[in-house]
């Protein structure tokens, strides 16, 4: 397991992490506790400085005691810890999202704010292979395409997030802690099937593992293949878009589409000269990348395929709606994308 962590830190499975500061998201569970210990043991070898951040979401009566346990643990290691207490129910109401999403957003906002140098330092989370399997299945349920179906990134440079344990099984983390005589906390809400993630964990994954005891190994292989493909397509689409003619903020024959305070994005044109001769697979990935740059919201495969079919057939004036108030219009062989808030990657 130390080899896995060191491989990440040396850049074998992501951008190298040396001579920097890492802020560890410490819930007190087995995964984040093991992560903090491993990085603590490797800190001198890798030139790391460490701090931790614990969030009390205020949703359970045990949470205050868990925060105190995190303080005691970090004090014993000599690692600075920041504890934040939130009222997630109130945040969920203000943001008009579920409590799980509100807690996640608040956590990552606090972690990002804790980075001493956002351009050089890292947020480290304890996501493990079981979490990756849940993420893959939830993406499948939501209709994600390839290669996003492969699951969350191990290394997310744009958001400065590193998940060093992502390819490690949870039982190995628990065995590691047990060998050291280190205890951890169990969140009682993890036993509830209220959330989709827990239903995957308790119901679906055990069935798949019963059918194939190597299911988690297959998830690991799928992740690796997906991220090889993702790296290829990100490089390919970026090169294609950078070579395309500059996108106008106003398209002749259409209503003006300059920067809009409500949407935050100008029109982006994919000209016919760029699209002609490309394989359908590359066109679809260009569409997805343009939509991603224009803001949040998953592009449904059905709509992407319909847009591509309209372009191939030359059906000018055809308009397609995408999540996040974004549109795509076929006009004179070009495709004009409009609207949408500024882009932000998802975890």
Swiss-Prot record:
GO biological process, one term: tRNA modification
Pfam families, per database record: ATP_bind_3
Keyword ATP-binding: yes
Region (Disordered): 243-263
Gene Ontology terms for molecular function: ATP binding; tRNA(Ile)-lysidine synthase activity
Gene3D superfamilies: HUPs (3.40.50.620)
Reaction(s) catalysed by this chain's protein: cytidine(34) in tRNA(Ile2) + L-lysine + ATP = lysidine(34) in tRNA(Ile2) + AMP + diphosphate + H(+)
Top-rank lineage group of the source organism: Bacteria
Location in or out of the cell: Cytoplasm
Family indicated by similarity: Belongs to the tRNA(Ile)-lysidine synthase family.
Free-text comment on this protein's domains from its UniProt entry: The N-terminal region contains the highly conserved SGGXDS motif, predicted to be a P-loop motif involved in ATP binding.
Name by which UniProt lists this protein: tRNA(Ile)-lysidine synthase
Species per Swiss-Prot/TrEMBL record: Nitratidesulfovibrio vulgaris (strain ATCC 29579 / DSM 644 / CCUG 34227 / NCIMB 8303 / VKM B-1760 / Hildenborough)
Biological classification of the source: Bacteria, Pseudomonadati, Thermodesulfobacteriota, Desulfovibrionia, Desulfovibrionales
Gene name per UniProt: tilS
């Amino acid at each position: 397991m130390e080899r896995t962590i060191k491989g990440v830190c040396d850049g074998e499975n992501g951008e190298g992490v040396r001579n920097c500061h890492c802020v560890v998201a410490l819930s007190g569970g087995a995964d984040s506790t093991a992560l903090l210990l491993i990085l603590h043991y490797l800190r001198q070898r890798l030139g790391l400085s460490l701090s931790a951040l614990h969030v009390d979401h205020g949703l359970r009566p045990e949470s205050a005691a868990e925060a105190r346990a995190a303080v005691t643990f970090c004090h014993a290691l000599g690692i600075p810890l920041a504890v934040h207490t939130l009222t997630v129910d109130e945040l969920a109401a203000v943001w008009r999202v579920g409590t799980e999403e509100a807690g996640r957003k608040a956590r990552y906002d606090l972690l990002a704010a804790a980075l001493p140098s956002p351009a050089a330092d890292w947020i480290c989370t304890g996501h493990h292979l079981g979490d990756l399997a849940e993420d893959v299945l939830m993406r499948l349920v939501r209709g994600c395409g390839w290669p996003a179906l492969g699951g969350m990134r191990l290394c997310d440079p744009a958001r400065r997030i590193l998940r060093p344990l992502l390819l490690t099984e949870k039982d190995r983390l628990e065995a590691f802690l047990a060998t050291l005589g280190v205890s951890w906390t169990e969140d009682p809400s993890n036993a509830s099937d209220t959330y989709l993630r827990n239903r995957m964990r308790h119901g679906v994954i055990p069935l798949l593992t019963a059918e194939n005891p190597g299911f988690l190994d297959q998830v690991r292989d799928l992740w690796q293949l997906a991220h090889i493909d993702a790296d290829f397509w990100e490089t390919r689409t970026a090169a294609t878009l950078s070579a395309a003619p500059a996108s106008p903020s106003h398209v002749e024959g259409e209503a003006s589409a300059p920067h809009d305070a409500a949407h935050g994005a100008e029109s982006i044109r994919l000209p016919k000269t760029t699209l002609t001769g490309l394989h359908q697979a590359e066109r679809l990935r260009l569409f997805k990348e343009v939509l991603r740059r224009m803001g949040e919201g998953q592009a449904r495969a059905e709509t992407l395929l319909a847009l591509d079919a309209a372009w191939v057939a030359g059906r000018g004036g055809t308009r397609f709606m995408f999540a996040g108030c974004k549109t795509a219009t076929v006009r004179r062989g070009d495709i004009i994308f409009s609207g949408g808030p500024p882009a932000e990657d998802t975890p």
